[in-house]
């Protein structure tokens, strides 16, 4: 890997523009990304409870919009008696939410001319998952499991973790016909972990394995579109951004400050990679609707 430096006269914005231009020049994306299609993500419609029923209704409503990607966000795996946030890690589709299987929904999305996408947070196990108690798969520090309130972290360096994630994520994507993955990451294991000469080196190794999974995804599914999320824009850095198609710019869904956030993000990633929420509500005034759509035009439009 190489570090890129910029030296020149001018201000910080000029330096940022030069570095972003270099990132854009080096970017390699799937063929489906050439025309930078508009997305629809159902999160701000279902708020973590997607289902076959509500997705089919959404597909009917957006049929005429010319959307390229339809992303099923978090919650598709949640148990009947638990919330989505602490159920990450097992990655078993809900038979209640998807009685005909999630592949039937992915097929319905493709039948409407869109690439089906789905949300994963594959590096963590939530408290309500079985994986949360599988000590042999999880990171430790000073011999104790690293627990961040309701989450633990897979030790991505272990072959058995590699096999587990391959089965639960890559096989799932392949078998169900998904062409897009939204990778989220909403926590941190802190200063590092056991298993190396220092805690920091352990943490670095795990971070490297996280990046290696992007290559594994592309090797298994060469046309896969990868969205880098992480609580919105918490993993916006050149190495990772050079390995993905785009990035959720922020978890700012509906606030009036979206253009300011988007403008600042444009200093560090190319506009073609900056996915900006445009959440439209029936109660919105015409001026609010125009504002939401125009704000998203500072990058990639993600409707909800």
PLM features per residue range, with description:
Residues 12-16, 49-52, 280:
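Short conserved micro-motifs at the rims of enzyme active sites and ligand-binding pockets
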Residues 295:
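C-terminal catalytic subdomain
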Residues 94-101, 105-111, 133-290, 298-300:
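Active-site neighborhood of glycoside hydrolase catalytic domains
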């Amino acid at each position: 890997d190489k570090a890129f430096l910029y030296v020149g006269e001018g201000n910080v914005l000029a330096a940022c523009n030069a570095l972003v231009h270099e990132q854009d020049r080096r970017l390699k994306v799937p063929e489906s990304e050439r025309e930078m299609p508009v997305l629809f993500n159902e999160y701000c419609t279902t708020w973590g409870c997607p289902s076959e029923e509500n997705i089919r209704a959404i597909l009917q409503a957006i049929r005429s919009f010319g959307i390229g990607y339809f992303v099923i966000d978090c919650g598709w795996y949640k148990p009947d008696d638990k919330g989505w946030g602490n159920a990450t890690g097992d990655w078993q589709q809900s038979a209640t939410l998807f009685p005909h299987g999630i592949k039937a929904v992915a097929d319905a999305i493709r039948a409407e001319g869109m690439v089906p996408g789905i949300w994963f947070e594959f590096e963590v196990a939530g408290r309500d998952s079985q994986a949360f108690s599988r000590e042999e798969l999880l990171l430790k520090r000073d011999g104790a499991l690293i627990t961040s309130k309701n989450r633990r972290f897979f030790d991505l360096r272990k072959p058995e973790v590699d096999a587990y994630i391959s089965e639960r994520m890559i096989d799932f994507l392949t078998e169900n016909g998904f062409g897009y993955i939204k990778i989220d990451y909403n926590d941190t294991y802190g200063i590092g972990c056991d298993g190396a000469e220092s805690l920091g080196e352990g943490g670095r190794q795990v971070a490297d394995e996280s990046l290696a999974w992007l290559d594994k995804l592309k090797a298994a599914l060469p046309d896969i579109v990868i969205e880098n999320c992480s609580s919105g824009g918490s993993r916006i850095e050149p190495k990772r951004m050079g390995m993905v198609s785009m990035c959720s710019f922020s978890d700012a869904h509906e606030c009036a400050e979206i253009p300011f956030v988007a403008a600042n993000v444009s200093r560090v990633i190319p506009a073609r990679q900056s996915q900006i929420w445009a959440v439209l509500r029936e109660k919105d005034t015409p001026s609010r609707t125009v504002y939401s759509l125009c704000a998203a035009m500072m990058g990639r439009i993600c409707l909800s």
